[in-house]
Design a protein with these regions (language model features):
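Small-residue-enriched hydrophobic alpha-helices in membranes
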Residues: 1-146
């Protein structure tokens, strides 16, 4: 496995940790790659081929083994960024469920990320995805004069 595939495999495992691929999870994963070098430079065909390869790997190995193999192919800095991507993907649809928390804890161990660093990363996404109560003086349904 090359480092490009390995990095994507970590995110793919995060959105499919429970064996389900939701539309929102898949879209979030694709979005996470589409705005990151070198993935944003890939053609649609290359991106589809990568996603197909990841799906085949996931089916053949399972999420755990796929993550183990991916971790061997990434530098420490790449592992940190891959963990951050996984954390954001899992946090973006609401607070971490206990099973998601266990998955991320396990992922941190596999990637060699300390509990302190993992908590620091997760705290950022807790803030980033916090529920906000906002008010506005803007008219939500403006009346447009004829």
């Amino acid at each position: 496995m090359d480092s490009l595939t390995a990095f994507a495999a970590v995110g793919f495992a995060a959105v499919s940790w429970d064996g389900h691929f939701t539309k929102a999870g898949t879209r979030s994963f694709r979005h996470a790659l589409d705005y990151r070098e070198p993935f944003c430079q890939m053609t649609d065909g290359d991106m589809i081929a990568l996603l197909d390869d990841l799906l085949d790997l996931r089916r053949a190995l399972g999420a755990h083994e796929m993550m183990l193999q991916a971790a061997k192919c990434l530098t420490s800095a790449q592992c940190m960024t891959a963990y951050a991507m996984a954390s954001e993907l899992m946090r973006s649809d609401g607070p971490f469920e206990p099973e998601e928390r266990r998955f991320l804890d396990h992922l941190a161990v596999i990637l060699g990320i300390s509990k302190f660093e993992a908590q620091r990363i997760d705290a950022v996404f807790e803030i980033f995805h916090a529920r906000l109560t906002l008010s506005s003086t803007l008219e939500l349904n403006p009346v447009i004069p004829c």
